[in-house]
Amino acid sequence: CNAGGLNVLRYGTMRDLVLGIEAVLPDGGLVSQLVPLHKNTTGYDLRQLLIGSEGTLAVITAATLKLFPLPQTYETAWVGADSIDRAVGLLALVQQRFGERLTSFELVGSRALELSAAYSRSAAPVSAPWHVLLELADAEPRDDLGGLLAEYLLQHGFDNSVLAQSASERQTLWTLRENISAAQRSLGVSIKHDIALPIERVAEFVGSCGAALRQTFAGIDIVLFGHLGDGSLHYNTFLPAATNNDAYAYEDAVNTVVYEHVLACGGTIAAEHGVGIVKRHWLPRVRSAAELRLMGAVKAAFDPHNIMNPGKLLPD
């Protein structure tokens, strides 16, 4: 996969972190490019081709990864915002002031926080319609970073915020974010969407898609959270008291509403978790005929007998 995760802002996605790859091909041949070169223009970049191919081209057996020194200073803040536009706008403000020290910027909807707080048996840090969990990090020990962040937030009208004063308080804030996935199980069966959008259109998508879903599916519950730093959102929907069968019956209809709004906003239907089986039939909507022909040709060149993870990623 080409996941990014909580620290994607600072460290990038898997594509950015893999310097070399060793892989076994479908015919048993071995491709080994484990030398940790930062630049190599001798031919096609097979490493980047294999990353995100979902096991359809080869089996990766080893990798050379880029590593970073562990930060010596962390400053973590939970910030409430009165609108999603304000929450999204905060990202550019903090980046402008703190640059690469901003390592995490997580968007959390109020419903997601409500569920996680109950599950974690922890009080919500602040009360607001929208929330941001952000973290600064520095390679050097610093005593002034927290004060600078607090002052900057106040300067820009974000006075509904909490800054962690200790390692345990930092962990409490992160636990609220990390427990969302487990907490939402209390709502029953989830129709999940792993999507990404241009950051400047996240607010537009949330507004238009939410309105369309609520108009079409009475009582639908939406749990939204994600890595706003690269536009990735976990957009999960729950139908009232849905059983497994109920959810599956509505899944295609819900997905159609969500994905149509994603595409209308210039986004993608697969951000981190890949295409797999269930999204294959959407690929012609997000990739051109020329791109699909090239992908099919690459697959055939690597795996002419279709033995590598057949039925995944590419449409029939």
Functional labels for PLM-detected ranges:
Residues C1-S104, M308:
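FAD-binding subdomain of flavoenzyme oxidoreductases
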Residues P69, E75-V257, H261, C265:
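C-terminal substrate-recognition/cap domain of FAD-linked oxidoreductases
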